[in-house]
């Protein structure tokens, strides 16, 4: 309780200080934006409660999460593109019915984003320079894509002056209040850094000495992107991170831990080939290459396309896209990993194949059911 009280006080002071800063977008408000999109205040508060839970914060933070969204227009954001496909931006922006998370991102003062802005050429470069100078030490930097470093970064040149991505990433990072590597390419190098990596592409964290919060995924969920922004607005600090600098609230559990097909894994029921009877029954996809047991992410909870579905629900196994070097270490994507058999504490930490796990768990389940029956009979006799 004492820790929760301290966190609440910290967040309240942080939000109070942000409220005193003039809004960067004049004549706009969260209430007006929600009304224009037909979203009620009740739905907004439900979203705030859901976001609070997702961030692993106590339920008492829900009103503060809502307040954080309301003052998000005080937060200048600069979004840079490096070597990538723009899929992370598409994940956030392309929706036939934008959710509240997408709308919150629209509400934020996005000072620079090459995909969205009208300016180009010299004018675009002037806009970037102006935003960095105007909000020096205040802006949030989001970088999408790996950073080529070979030939002093000449494999990626951007804009009218031909600055390298390496130069731009270093310069923008130097003056940022917080830095987020959006997507696996920016977090870990991505496909650009896959063997043989001729451009010597590296993650953002390798080219700056500033702390970087990795938000991997190919692409990451829009909620994970916006959730990190909300956390920064609330506390002004980094969230609790794992060994790969990923927020634990989003990447603390494996895909396997929360998968809707987990029961079939435990029961030894596996898809043997795509399109077979097991596939039609929704059996576990481990034998056809699912990397869920090795991948840390919250896809099964958040899903994609306005919470419609996600790869495993659609019938294809996880490819481990939020893990470092997954292009080199997780393939072939439609085959189980012979070199990294699933490790489970149920068997004393020993590696097991899918077949062995299923058979052993079936045996354990039978023993458990028999024990339950015996205990039930004993209870009845006593009654």
Predicted regions mapped to residue ranges:
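N-terminal secretory signal peptides
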Residues: 1-39, 67
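Local cysteine-cluster metal-coordination motifs and their immediate loop/turn environment
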Residues: 83-89, 184, 188, 260, ...
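Alpha-helical transmembrane segments
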Residues: 364-377
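Short cysteine/histidine-rich metal-coordination sites, predominantly Zn2+-binding motifs
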Residues: 277-278, 302-311, 332-342
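N-terminal export signals
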Residues: 43-65
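A conserved mid-domain beta-alpha-beta active-site/ligand-binding segment of alpha/beta enzyme cores
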Residues: 230, 234-303
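Juxtamembrane/start-of-transmembrane alpha-helix segments at the extracytoplasmic/lumenal side
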Residues: 347-360
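Extended, subdomain-level signal for the structured scaffold at the beginning of enzyme domains
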Residues: 45, 63-169, 368
């Amino acid at each position: 309780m004492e820790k929760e009280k301290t966190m609440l006080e910290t967040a309240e002071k942080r939000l109070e200080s942000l409220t005193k800063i003039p809004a960067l977008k004049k004549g706009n408000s969260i209430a007006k934006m929600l009304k224009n999109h037909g979203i009620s205040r009740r739905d907004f508060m439900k979203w705030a409660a859901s976001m609070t839970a997702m961030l692993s914060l106590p339920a008492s933070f829900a009103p503060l999460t809502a307040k954080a969204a309301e003052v998000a227009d005080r937060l200048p954001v600069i979004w840079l593109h490096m070597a990538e496909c723009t899929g992370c931006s598409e994940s956030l922006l392309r929706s036939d019915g934008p959710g509240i998370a997408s709308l919150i991102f629209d509400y934020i003062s996005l000072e620079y984003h090459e995909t969205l802005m009208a300016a180009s050429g010299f004018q675009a470069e002037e806009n970037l320079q102006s935003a960095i100078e105007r909000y020096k030490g205040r802006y949030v930097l989001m970088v999408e894509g790996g950073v080529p470093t070979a030939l002093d970064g000449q494999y990626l040149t951007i804009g009218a002056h031909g600055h390298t991505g390496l130069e731009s990433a270093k310069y923008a990072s130097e003056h940022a209040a917080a830095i987020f590597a959006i997507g696996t390419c920016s977090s870990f190098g991505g496909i650009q850094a896959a063997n043989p990596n001729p451009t010597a592409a590296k993650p953002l964290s390798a080219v700056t000495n500033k702390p970087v919060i990795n938000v991997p995924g190919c692409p990451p969920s829009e909620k994970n992107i916006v959730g990190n922004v909300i956390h920064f607005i609330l506390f002004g600090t980094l969230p609790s991170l794992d060994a790969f600098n990923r927020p634990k609230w989003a990447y603390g559990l494996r895909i396997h831990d929360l998968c809707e097909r987990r029961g079939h894994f435990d029961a030894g029921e596996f898809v043997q080939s795509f399109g077979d009877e097991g596939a039609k029954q929704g059996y576990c996809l481990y034998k056809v290459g699912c990397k869920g047991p090795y991948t840390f992410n919250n896809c099964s909870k958040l899903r994609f396309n306005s919470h419609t579905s996600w790869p495993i629900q659609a019938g294809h196994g996880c490819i481990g896209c939020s893990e470092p070097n997954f292009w080199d270490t997780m393939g072939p994507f439609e085959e189980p990993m012979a070199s990294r058999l699933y490790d489970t504490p149920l068997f004393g930490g020993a590696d097991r194949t899918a077949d062995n796990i299923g058979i052993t768990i079936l045996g354990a389940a039978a023993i458990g059911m028999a024990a339950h029956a015996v205990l039930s009979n004993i209870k009845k006799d006593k009654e």
